[in-house]
Regions:
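Long, low-complexity intrinsically disordered regions
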Residues: 1-209
Length: 209
């Protein structure tokens, strides 16, 4: 994705290119084949979802063709890990590769050790600690429970992105809010977060994450 004259231009393959990824299932298979893959084009030519799909259906909300929609579907399946893993931007990591990926990003630290060595912020610790009692949380729930806001902690988006970059948090799903009185969904889809360990329990990847 490049900005040319104020207009965002998507890269991609021709519609009839035999190497084009055509479905979200094919994309999962490709991620498992290569190990990890950013969503958008970057400084490494050919190393992104964008480089392997058509540029015709981005943000059309078509589950059959829209790669932006595919990321929601794939996160929901849990078959690969999704989050802001690459230069603070979105991407995927296979469950087989995730332990090595996370170990590298964490410099070998689990979060408790990182905190003890004063390498983690108190804001990051507050977020990670939430998952000792919660299997998953909407992003707005994390924000509220930790006390981010005008009169409280600052830069929630930056902190939660740092935790994803370090492999401590992943995006489990995208869901709408539910009204308390009747459970009816409303509004935009919102990211739902969890830890890699809890994600592994959900999908049965006990030996992989």
């Amino acid at each position: 994705m490049a900005n040319e004259g104020g207009e965002w231009i998507m890269r991609g393959l021709a519609w009839d290119d035999p190497f084009r990824i055509r479905t979200w299932r094919e994309l999962i298979n490709y991620i498992n084949q290569v190990g990890f893959l950013p969503l958008f084009a970057n400084e490494v030519p050919g190393f992104s979802v964008e480089d392997h799909v058509s540029n015709l259906f981005w943000w059309t909300d078509d589950p059959e063709q829209d790669p932006w929609k595919w990321r929601e579907i794939i996160a929901h399946t849990g078959e690969v890990a999704y989050g802001k893993f690459f230069n603070r931007k979105a991407g995927f990591v296979s469950l087989k590769w995730f332990p090595a990926f996370a170990n590298y990003r964490r410099d070998g630290y689990d979060f408790d050790a990182r905190w003890e060595d004063e390498l983690a912020s108190h804001r990051a610790k507050k977020i990670v600690d939430l998952f000792e009692e919660n299997e998953e949380l909407y992003s707005f729930e994390c924000k509220k429970k930790v006390g981010f806001g005008k009169e409280g902690e600052k830069n929630f988006d930056g902190v939660i992105t740092d935790l994803q970059m370090q492999g401590y948090i992943v995006v489990r799903d995208f869901r709408k809010r539910k009204r308390k009185k009747d459970g009816v969904e409303y509004g935009w889809l919102i990211s739902v977060h969890t830890t890699p360990a809890l994600h592994a329990l959900r999908v049965g990847a006990f030996d992989r994450i």
